[in-house]
């Protein structure tokens, strides 16, 4: 009995501990010779250096091919990752993978679904989507506190307007089904802007209480709204299509768009988005 009297308060204290989480989403641009001076072998060290400097607890990448995943694994030894290639659920095609600090977190379970009418079928696509798209997720436990939470990472179609709308509807359904009442983060390259129809589904409080970290942040470290630049430091088209959305459980402590560059080019054609959360 004395043991129980000591243990129960400790369990109660652990369950009330606050988790502080630094998350980042980054479309790193696939490895293709067509990019010339911006090819992956030339810029991979810059991408890894940016990530080392920002030190996110968890970050999601989009467009990563298997060789790029291997490069990041080698260049960022403090991280482990979960993800699958979208074409075969193995190593073929682009990943929407999640990297996490293995000294701070452990993965309880993970999964991937396809943004289609048959989300359990690898390689499937539907609606007016040009190519196969996925959402990968992990259920994390913070080792220090024992608190757990979900992170979802996705990349929407770049051409199909209906596909983007239907993908947002599907993700809402899947998150409710998978995460239940647990805290969660949804991030990625959504290929829609705040004025587009799918964005309105994010703030539909009657369905799920999710906030855009750009607007919810207590401290906004940038007023820039551009996340796609096509590698260009100057003269880029300005589009905000990369987001970090947080469930109602989360305080958004800060928001930033990382504009690190060499004076001519950014390390990728997208800029990484960073948010600090607590729950």
Give each language-model segment a name.
Residues 130-132, 141-165, 169, 178:
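Metal-dependent phosphoester/phosphodiester hydrolase catalytic core
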Residues 30-37, 108, 161, 220-224:
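Short, solvent-exposed loop/turn elements at domain surfaces
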Residues 28, 63, 154-156, 189-190, ...:
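Active-site metal-binding loops of divalent metal-dependent hydrolases
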Residues 13-75, 87-94, 169, 279:
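N-terminal, active-site-proximal structural segment of metallo-dependent hydrolase catalytic domains
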Residues 104, 162, 173-184, 192-279:
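Metal-dependent phosphoester-hydrolase catalytic domains
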Residues 60-62, 83-84, 185-189, 212-215:
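Active-site neighborhood of phospho(di)ester-bond hydrolases with catalytic His/Asp-centered motifs
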Residues 58-148, 254-257:
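Structured beta-strand-rich core segments of catalytic domains in phosphoester-bond hydrolases
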